[in-house]
């Protein structure tokens, strides 16, 4: 899961956008 390593690298705005992608439960 290389994307998981890039999560903390990208800005918070992107994290919120990727949140539903990494956590489909929510």
UniProtKB/Swiss-Prot annotation:
The keyword Glycoprotein does not apply. The keyword Manganese does not apply. Keywords: Calcium, Hydrolase, Magnesium, Metal-binding. Its EC number is 3.-.-.-. Its cofactor is Ca(2+); Mg(2+). GO terms for molecular function: hydrolase activity; metal ion binding. Belongs to the FAH family. May have hydrolase activity. This is Fumarylacetoacetate hydrolase domain-containing protein 2A. It comes from Mesocricetus auratus (Golden hamster).
């Amino acid at each position: 899961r290389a994307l998981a390593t890039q999560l903390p690298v990208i800005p918070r705005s992107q994290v919120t956008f990727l949140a539903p992608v990494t956590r489909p439960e929510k």
